[in-house]
């Protein structure tokens, strides 16, 4: 088991020595954790909460993130897919859609190497597409933190209670 784990780490390191790829992937992993924990932590009754009438509900914000990730990460993999999270309303369905989008993004990140990072997919490089997705996810998570605070819940990124 240990040998297989070490082989996987060595394989990952063999794919890229580019610090930009490694650092951006680390940022992706971080926001993935925050968003996953946020989706789980928000009570289902608050998925319909809107801080003001003209902005998205918490559930719609989560759907927007999942659909954006599906679109961008599948594009980086070479075959753009449209997400279906916007058609979902229950917490379970939205959490599942978010998980599916992360599976697509994990595959996209696993596919990035020094050799293919600058290959163009549409108007951006593969790496540029993934960087844009990380930027968008962080921006949307920032909005999401406000929903948590307005409901009296500590957002995952600032929760120091040890919950991971």
Please tell me what each predicted stretch does:
Residues 41:
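Short, polar/acidic, helix-capping and beta-turn segments at strand->helix junctions
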């Amino acid at each position: 088991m240990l040998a297989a784990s070490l082989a996987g780490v060595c394989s990952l390191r063999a794919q890229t020595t580019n610090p930009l790829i490694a650092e951006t992937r680390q940022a992706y992993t971080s926001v993935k954790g925050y968003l996953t924990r946020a989706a789980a932590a928000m009570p289902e009754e608050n998925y319909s909460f809107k801080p003001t009438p003209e902005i998205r509900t918490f559930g719609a914000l989560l759907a927007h993130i999942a659909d954006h990730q599906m679109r961008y990460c599948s594009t980086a993999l070479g075959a753009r897919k449209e997400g279906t999270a916007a058609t979902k309303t229950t917490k379970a369905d939205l959490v599942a859609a978010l998980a599916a989008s992360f599976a697509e993004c994990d595959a996209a990140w696993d596919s990035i190497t020094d050799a293919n990072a600058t290959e163009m997919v549409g108007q951006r490089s593969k790496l540029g597409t993934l960087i844009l997705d990380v930027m968008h996810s962080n921006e949307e998570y920032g909005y999401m933190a406000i929903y948590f605070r307005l409901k009296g819940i500590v957002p995952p990124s600032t929760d120091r209670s040890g919950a991971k």
